[in-house]
């Protein structure tokens, strides 16, 4: 019938029914679906643009690609449609032809089915008021916009209006599915509005604006039946039509009511998902709001259970309410009412109104009577999510009900109004719920596992062989199947909870199902295309649809990110609950070995390898079923996390394929590891490993060195072993090109035995992957075993040996066999194996007497190679033994005290495991001979020499049961604690890191959270977990709430003992030692400053500028804001990249802290703030607590101690006493005595030069009339006190000249021979740096002078005598001094007064008050350092005039006039300066360091790896008492004095970034332990590696002619011994660093704020003095700034409140600081911690941070 109608009217152009019609929609105030006209116009424009890109074809030529666009010439064409929803906009005239729409208005052209025929129906005629369609496509139509009102006056007026102007509108699309009915109703209502029928549409209250006429009712009925076929109507619509088939108005009214209801539901869901509460509003109001939402959703059929509601509420809690999030683990069945009780309690406590307000808490009986229910009893409503977003929505209602622009797939709920056409509601973060997700427990637990996941969709995976889903709500017929093994792309096991069916209901009303696996341990829900293909469903990515083989489209595919997704709305939900799924395969594990015990027993191998080994019987005695694997899924071994931590996975498959063709033991891989430093001489420093290519069997051999003969012995041993044991001959050995393998000796040996050496390419470690990976694996195991057992590091090779034995017995997942099985050996009997470090008692077969103990405490290492015994370490004898006479010590976990292992008791498991072996031993033990306690023949560990160090005792912490421990566990724990506790001795020789230095550790600290990648944690999956250090050293039974409330901070250590050989004209407020203050971690400091008010002031400033630096005006500051901002304008602060805040999901916050340990070595401060993990020592001592077994000294006689060296006289040095005794740093002696330079000098040429210098000096002394040559005095006649010893010293200068100097021994001069009040002044280094900086900024000329024999120009007042020079040969005579000889106490002061008088009186200079040796006049500035002068002037002639006057009195030499405009090089007071006027200045010491450092006899490594920083955080100087021989001690102290003396000289000259490390080591000069010496060597090595670094200055270009002096201050709280704080200050002049200080605070500070105040108060005096100096030298105005990262300190400075000062010291410091800031017009500014370059002065920093803070001024 339809085809006939089309053929009858073939002369009519079959264009769009709305062709070239432009109409504005009529807005009705009562319209609940108000869509703006702009959207309609945009839709029309978008459609026009899209269709204009299509090729226009004649009606008879082609068939459109869209199956819905049937050609009008085709007899089988369906009801005309204008394509899918996105193209249902109005079309132009040229685009009408290919479309299938027939025009509306002709009765025969209306396609309808017979059921639509009704007696009421009649076709609209030409006079009808309804819109007509054009009779000719070529006639352009223009319809004026109707008026805004929709009310018709009467039918006649309507007729006249429609007659005068014909209106053509776009018809609605055809309804094609019941699920699309809600969307279709919206377009149908829009169609009625455009047809001037908006007034008949029911409003919100269900009533239309006006009455409907009969014609309108007929039009409504017919159009509804035409475009809404009955087979596609929802059930509820059919029910209405079955009663009255003309009641279209009721259908519209009910549809609008559903739309309004769904809008409120969507808003409630969004509000519930975005709850936020921090206590700013009353708790009552918050509870009322939440309960109203939940009740409203429950009434609408969307039921929210208690658990989901509690999770949503707790997720929005912040501030002090945030800790309630953790209650979900303590109370699994918490209700909303209970949660609000806790919220009310915190709110009342916060408001302090518990006594004034009635208690809100309800009785339990009230809770039982609560009528509200939050259980989920019905299926949750599905709310689809539309990924397309409309940008011009104007209201929330409009967004929720916007007309769709896409054809969405069907929903599973036919009775609900789908929101697939709505714009997605944007929530606050990725954890919030979105429209389209089910508000269920599964949604809350699995929302957004990945950032690129499309919520509510399945990921189509072509590589997955199985379908996996996280939610159990879609699994039908679920059943347990624990035998299924599923691995991911990285071959890691994925635990499976259950298997079931996944049922689909596609849009063609077909149903199908596939198998699905349930697991919560995946990032996406995966839909396998392979399983879909098995049910005849394929994915077409060109059309982006799922379809059958016959082309039937089932569902659309969405491309989101890099993946393709299909909506979950096609899944049929099941009625199975999550707990059912999660518990379906819970198995009985009674009497099974716990997995952590087996994991530790088998050398911390991973679970997969252990299961393979048990399945293939490579581990005997028990089966796989004897192990409880339930904990293996989520088990995280802390020791594995630390011991096996790695950066990335090794690249596999790097070996050549031909290697697989070799027979067993014909192709070996070998490699050498080492050296391991800081071990006793008897312990090996290297090991060499061998791996067979075919069987993967491994051997390891210890080495003490890498000499040729040592390597040859090992090769001879391994070849003989393989030949005799396996009857095989080695053909090829693959090795790297190390010298130990390429030497001629080994090459001849291999050639003699017919073995081909296969060398890898140089620096190609991947080609040597087998050996390299084995070494890495063994080292991981070694670190883990030592970490777990707590044994000292010198037993490292025993851990390697133990790991090798175990790994040879573990099956390979690839070959399914172990190396022993491949080699034809029996499996390892685990009953003969003990955990590494297992405490045992060894029988003493030869005690000293019959009453002495017969048992010796020891620790099991590994099975013996040479007997049936076990290698056991005996700490009391400091050796290892090979014996079978041992008993396992019960109740002793070898190394579990800090990782919560104490809750695991393996005694019973160990007894069961070793029962058969022990019975075998017992049955065969008839009589034990005296030599049964056989000493091990392993020469590498038989006798451990530990004489320089002694084992340390560390107090063990008793682990008390926590709140979550069951009562039974409490009892067991208490019993276990009461037993004796054997602990391994603490490490004697701690490892020294290459890049860490710092003082002894006093306390633990709060670390920063970081992501740790578990690469071998013993579990079966990878998890990012934060490692948290212990909050304190107290027992672990402290309450969790108390631990949260405490504010534990990072502290960072530095110390300084500053040596200043010049007078410092600055009065220090903190005593003689300048100290520095503690520092909180960078992130914690920012949080506390920004989000909390300081304890001193209730309202600190909180505003930050765009540069993260906040200038804060003091009360007396009157400068403008731009002046304050200019303070930080040109400072050399680091450029920080923008960082987005890292947010950790709740599961990370809920993990219990894993306490880690601190390795005792290198400088790292006491709790560094930048250390990601602060680790506490886990080394144990046999004398840890009172209950442990004690071994008295008289128990062992000399026979037992024969392996130890005889006692020697030693000096015992205590760390604190040594640090407190340090007074000064002894400078390096770079000169030679007379006998060294001349008498015994074997270098003839050098000797002649020194003789020449000697005579030159003598002549100069005679010329200057240094002594009275007229009379010689007899020694007996002169008072010995007035006789000064003298000597000649010789030196070779850097320019190559040889110089001699006759000096007096002022160090032994009697006090009566000089005036102690006289001062020998020289220019202060800050004055020199200030003058140089001003010279650069003002284009000054710099002239350097030298006055020869300067001291000899000064007369001496006292009566002093010296011995004549040696060449005169008058040893018994004395001569009287007339001039100030070099070396006399008063010589410097005499010369200073002489030159000062001459400069003032003869040269017209004046000395700057407070700055000795700085002279100036209106044109010239002079800096005087003994006999060196540096002149600065704008005009070079001014310098020349001064030089001429100086030459008139003194022998003046011009070193550098400085007249060139090019770069000029100076050597001023040891500084090598490169200066180009008006451009830059560079200060360094490269040449000096290149000459001096090699003379220190420090082991330098010029070709090795360069250190990137002078020290690293996290490692500490050991406080153990030091025992050294007297001579050895003096020698090491002298060496430390030389090294620290040089480092101090460099640091205070220009390397201010090293001051913290220098000062810390300077405190340990009298404590020269091996660790301290190694740290000092590291510092010298770093100085050597960076000797070319320079302090860079550039000429400043200020906007105003002013000088800017800034000090940047920082402090580290309580990080020094005796809880002193470290303070640091850096001074900058016009953006150039001119000085720095890093010192220890003189007084103990009690808070971080107090430490910061102390640091600032220490900096202000010098700041003021420098300010005065600058104003004297340069008359420009000066701006003074003070920068700190402590907002609390700033608030104290600007506050007028004195009530909160906690004590007198703090108050006086703060008040003085206020006075200094206000009185000196200081601009106090806030600087972000990450940009605070003074951080390097107070703590050790990570490499990246250290470089970031220093690379702008030191490079």
Swiss-Prot record:
Domain RNase H Ty1/copia-type, chain residue ranges per copy: 1610-1752
Residue stretches of biased makeup (Polar residues): 48-60, 71-93, 127-152, 1005-1015, 1054-1082, 1101-1111
Coiled coil feature spans: none
UniProt PTM: Initially, virus-like particles (VLPs) are composed of the structural unprocessed proteins Gag and Gag-Pol, and also contain the host initiator methionine tRNA (tRNA(i)-Met) which serves as a primer for minus-strand DNA synthesis, and a dimer of genomic Ty RNA. Processing of the polyproteins occurs within the particle and proceeds by an ordered pathway, called maturation. First, the protease (PR) is released by autocatalytic cleavage of the Gag-Pol polyprotein yielding capsid protein p45 and a Pol-p154 precursor protein.
Residues given in the record as Mg(2+) 2 binding sites: 1346, 1427-1428
Enzyme Commission number(s) from the entry: 3.4.23.-, 2.7.7.49, 2.7.7.7, 3.1.26.4
Location relative to the cell: Cytoplasm; Nucleus
Any one GO BP annotation for this protein: DNA integration
Note: Retrotransposons are mobile genetic entities that are able to replicate via an RNA intermediate and a reverse transcription step. In contrast to retroviruses, retrotransposons are non-infectious, lack an envelope and remain intracellular. Ty1 retrotransposons belong to the copia elements (pseudoviridae).
Listed name of the protein: Transposon Ty1-JR2 Gag-Pol polyprotein
Organism of this sequence: Saccharomyces cerevisiae (strain ATCC 204508 / S288c) (Baker's yeast)
């Amino acid at each position: 019938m339809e085809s006939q109608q089309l053929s009858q009217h073939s002369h009519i152009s079959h264009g769009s029914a709305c062709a070239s019609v432009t109409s504005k929609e009529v807005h009705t105030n009562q319209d609940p679906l108000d869509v703006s006209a702009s959207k309609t116009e945009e839709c029309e424009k978008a459609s026009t643009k899209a269709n204009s890109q299509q090729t226009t074809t004649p009606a008879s030529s082609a068939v459109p690609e869209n199956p819905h666009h049937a050609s009008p010439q085709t007899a089988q064409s369906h009801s005309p449609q204008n394509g899918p929803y996105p193209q249902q906009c109005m079309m132009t005239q040229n685009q009408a032809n290919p479309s299938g729409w027939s025009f509306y208005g002709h009765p025969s052209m209306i396609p309808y089915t017979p059921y639509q025929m009704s007696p009421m129906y009649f076709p609209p005629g030409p006079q009808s008021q309804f819109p007509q369609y054009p009779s000719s496509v070529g006639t352009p139509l223009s319809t004026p916009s109707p008026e805004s009102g929709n009310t018709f006056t009467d039918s006649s007026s309507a007729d006249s209006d429609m007659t005068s102007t014909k209106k053509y509108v776009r018809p609605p699309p055809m309804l094609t599915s019941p699920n699309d009915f809600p969307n279709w109703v919206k377009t149908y209502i829009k169609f009625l509005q455009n047809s001037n029928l908006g007034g008949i549409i029911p409003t919100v209250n269900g009533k239309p604006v006006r009455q409907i006429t009969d014609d309108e009712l007929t039009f409504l009925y017919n159009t509804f039946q035409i475009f809404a076929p009955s087979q596609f109507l929802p059930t509820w619509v059919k029910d209405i039509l079955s009663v009255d088939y003309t009641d279209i108005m009721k259908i519209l009214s009910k549809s609008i009511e559903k739309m309004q209801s769904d809008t409120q539901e969507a808003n409630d869901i969004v509000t519930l998902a975005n709850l936020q509460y921090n206590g700013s509003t009353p708790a009552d109001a918050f509870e009322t709001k939440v309960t109203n939402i939940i009740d409203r959703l429950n009434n609408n059929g969307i039921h929210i259970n208690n658990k989901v509601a509690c999770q949503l509420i707790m997720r929005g809690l912040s501030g002090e309410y945030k800790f309630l999030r953790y209650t979900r683990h303590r109370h699994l069945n918490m209700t909303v009412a209970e949660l609000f009780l806790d919220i009310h309690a915190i709110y009342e406590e916060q408001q302090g109104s518990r006594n004034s307000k009635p208690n809100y808490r309800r009785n339990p009986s009230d809770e039982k009577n609560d009528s509200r229910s939050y259980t989920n009893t019905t299926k949750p409503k599905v709310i689809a999510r539309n990924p397309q977003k409309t940008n011009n929505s104007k209201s929330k209602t409009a967004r929720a009900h916007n007309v769709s622009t896409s054809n969405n797939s069907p929903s599973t709920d036919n009775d609900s109004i789908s929101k697939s056409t709505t714009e997605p509601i944007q929530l606050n973060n990725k954890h919030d719920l979105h429209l389209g997700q089910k508000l269920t427990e599964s949604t809350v637990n699995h929302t957004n596992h990945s950032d690129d996941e499309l919520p509510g969709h399945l990921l189509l995976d072509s590589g997955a062989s199985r379908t996996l889903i996280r939610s159990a709500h879609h699994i039908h017929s679920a059943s347990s199947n624990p035998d299924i093994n599923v691995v991911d792309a990285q071959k890691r096991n994925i635990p499976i909870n259950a298997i079931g069916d996944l049922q689909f209901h596609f849009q063609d009303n077909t149903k199908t199902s596939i198998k699905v696996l349930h697991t919560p341990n995946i990032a996406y829900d995966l839909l396998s295309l392979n399983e879909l293909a098995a049910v005849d469903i394929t994915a077409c990515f060109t059309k982006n649809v799922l379809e059958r083989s016959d082309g039937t489209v089932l569902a659309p595919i969405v491309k989101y990110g890099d993946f393709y997704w299909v909506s979950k709305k096609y899944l049929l939900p099941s009625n199975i609950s999550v707990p059912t799924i999660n518990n379906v395969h819970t198995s009985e594990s009674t009497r099974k070995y716990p997995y952590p015990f087996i994991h530790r027993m088998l050398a911390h191998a991973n679970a997969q390898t252990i299961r393979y080994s048990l399945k293939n019987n490579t581990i005997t005695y028990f089966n796989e079923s004897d192990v409880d694997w339930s904990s293996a899924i989520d088990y995280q071994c802390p020791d594995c996390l630390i011991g096996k931590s790695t950066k990335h996975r090794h690249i596999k498959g790097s070996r050549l394929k031909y290697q697989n063709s070799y027979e067993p033991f014909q192709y070996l891989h070998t490699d050498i590891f080492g050296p391991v430093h800081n071990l006793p001489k008897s312990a090996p420093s290297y090991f060499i490993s061998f791996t067979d290519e075919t069987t993967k069997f491994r051997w390891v051999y210890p080495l003490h060195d890498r000499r040729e003969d040592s390597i040859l012995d090992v090769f001879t041993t391994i070849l003989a072993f393989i030949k005799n044991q396996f009857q095989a001959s080695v053909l090829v050995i693959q090795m790297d090109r190390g010298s130990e393998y390429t030497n001629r000796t080994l090459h001849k040996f291999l050639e003699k035995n017919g073995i081909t050496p296969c060398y890898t390419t140089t620096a190609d470690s991947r080609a040597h992957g087998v050996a390299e990976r084995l070494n890495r694996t063994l080292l991981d195991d070694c670190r883990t075993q030592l970490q777990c057992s707590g044994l000292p590091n010198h037993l490292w090779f025993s851990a390697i040996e133990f790991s090798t034995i175990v790994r040879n017995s573990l099956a390979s997942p690839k070959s399914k066999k172990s190396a022993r099985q491949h080699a034809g050996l029996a499996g390892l009997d685990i009953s003969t194996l003990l955990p590494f470090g297992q405490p045992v008692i060894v029988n003493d077969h030869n005690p000293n007497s019959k009453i002495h103990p017969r048992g010796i405490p020891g620790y099991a290492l590994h099975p013996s190679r040479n007997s049936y015994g076990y290698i056991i370490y005996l700490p009391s004898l400091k050796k290892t033994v090979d014996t079978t006479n041992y008993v396992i010590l019960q109740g002793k976990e070898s190394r579990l005290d800090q990782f919560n292992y104490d809750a695991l008791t393996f005694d019973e498991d160990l007894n069961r495991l070793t029962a058969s072996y022990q019975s075998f031993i017992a049955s065969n033990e008839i009589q034990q001979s005296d030599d049964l306690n056989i000493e091990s023949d392993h020469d590498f560990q038989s006798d451990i020499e530990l004489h320089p160090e002694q084992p340390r005792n560390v107090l063990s912490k008793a682990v008390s049961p926590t709140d979550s421990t069951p009562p039974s566990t409490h009892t067991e724990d208490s019993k276990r604690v009461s037993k004796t506790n054997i602990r391994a001795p603490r490490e004697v020789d701690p490892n020294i890191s290459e890049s860490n230095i710092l003082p002894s550790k006093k306390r633990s600290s709060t670390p920063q959270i970081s992501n740790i990648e578990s690469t071998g944690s013993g579990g079966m999956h990878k998890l990012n977990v934060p490692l948290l250090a212990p909050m304190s050293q107290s027992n672990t039974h402290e309450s969790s709430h108390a631990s949260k409330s405490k504010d534990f901070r990072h502290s960072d250590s530095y110390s300084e003992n500053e040596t200043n050989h010049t007078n410092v004209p600055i009065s220090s407020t903190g005593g003689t030692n300048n100290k520095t203050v503690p520092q909180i971690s960078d992130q914690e400091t920012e949080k506390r400053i920004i989000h909390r008010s300081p304890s001193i002031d209730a309202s600190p400033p909180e505003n930050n500028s765009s540069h993260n630096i906040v200038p804060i005006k003091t009360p007396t500051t009157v400068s403008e804001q731009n002046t304050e901002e200019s303070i930080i304008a040109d400072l050399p602060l680091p450029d920080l990249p923008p960082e987005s805040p890292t947010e950790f999901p709740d599961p990370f916050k809920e993990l219990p802290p894993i306490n880690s340990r601190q390795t005792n070595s290198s400088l790292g401060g006491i709790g560094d703030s930048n250390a990601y993990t602060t680790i506490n020592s886990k080394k144990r001592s046999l004398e840890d607590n009172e209950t442990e077994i004690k071994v008295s000294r008289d128990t062992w006689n000399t026979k037992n101690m024969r392996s130890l060296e005889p006692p020697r006289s030693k000096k015992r040095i205590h760390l604190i006493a040594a640090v407190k005794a340090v007074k000064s740093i002894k400078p390096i002696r770079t000169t030679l005595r007379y006998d060294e330079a001349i008498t015994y000098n074997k270098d003839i040429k050098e000797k002649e030069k020194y003789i020449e210098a000697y005579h030159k000096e003598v002549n100069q002394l005679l010329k200057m009339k240094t002594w009275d040559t007229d009379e010689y005095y007899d020694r007996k006649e002169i008072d010995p006190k007035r006789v000064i010893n003298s000597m000649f010293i010789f030196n070779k200068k850097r320019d190559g000249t040889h110089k001699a100097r006759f000096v007096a021994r002022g160090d032994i001069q009697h006090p009566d021979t000089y005036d102690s009040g006289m001062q020998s002044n020289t220019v202060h280094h800050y004055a020199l740096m200030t003058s140089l900086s001003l010279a650069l900024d003002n284009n000054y000329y710099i002239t350097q002078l030298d006055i020869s024999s300067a001291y000899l120009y000064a007369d001496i007042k006292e009566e002093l005598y010296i011995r004549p020079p040696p060449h005169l040969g008058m040893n018994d005579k004395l001569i009287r001094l007339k001039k100030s000889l070099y070396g006399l106490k008063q010589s410097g002061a005499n010369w200073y007064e002489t030159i000062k008088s001459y400069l003032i009186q003869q040269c017209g200079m004046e000395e700057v008050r407070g700055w000795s040796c700085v002279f100036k006049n209106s044109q010239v500035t002079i800096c005087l350092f003994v006999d060196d002068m540096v002149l600065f002037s704008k005009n070079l002639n001014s310098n020349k005039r001064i030089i001429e006057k100086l030459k008139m009195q003194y022998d003046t030499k011009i070193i550098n006039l400085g007249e060139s405009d090019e770069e000029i090089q100076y050597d001023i007071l040891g500084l090598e300066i490169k200066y180009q006027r008006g451009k830059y200045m560079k200060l360094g010491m490269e040449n000096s360091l290149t000459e001096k450092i090699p003379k220190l006899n420090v082991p330098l490594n010029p070709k090795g790896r360069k250190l990137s920083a002078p020290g690293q955080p996290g490692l500490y100087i050991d406080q153990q008492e030091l025992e050294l021989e007297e001579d050895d001690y003096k020698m090491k102290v002298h060496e430390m004095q030389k090294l620290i003396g040089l480092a101090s000289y460099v640091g205070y000259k220009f390397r201010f970034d090293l001051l913290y490390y220098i000062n810390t080591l300077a405190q340990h000069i009298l404590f020269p332990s091996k660790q301290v010496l190694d740290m000092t060597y590291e510092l010298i090595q770093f100085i050597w590696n960076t000797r070319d670094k320079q302090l860079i200055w550039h000429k400043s270009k200020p906007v105003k002619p002013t000088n800017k002096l800034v000090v940047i201050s920082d402090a580290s709280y309580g990080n020094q011994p005796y809880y002193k704080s470290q303070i640091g200050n850096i001074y900058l002049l016009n953006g150039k660093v001119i000085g720095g200080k890093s010192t220890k605070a003189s007084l103990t500070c009690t808070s971080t704020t107090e430490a910061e105040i102390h640091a600032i108060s220490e900096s202000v005096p010098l700041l003021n003095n420098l300010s005065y100096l600058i104003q004297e030298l340069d008359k420009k105005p000066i701006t003074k700034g003070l920068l700190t990262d402590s907002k609390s300190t700033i608030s104290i400075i600007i506050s007028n409140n004195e009530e909160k000062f906690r004590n007198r010291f703090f108050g006086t410091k703060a008040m003085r600081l206020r006075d200094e800031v206000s009185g000196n017009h200081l601009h106090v500014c806030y600087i972000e911690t990450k940009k605070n370059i003074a951080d390097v002065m107070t703590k050790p920093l990570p490499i990246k941070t250290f470089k970031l803070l220093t690379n702008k001024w030191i490079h």
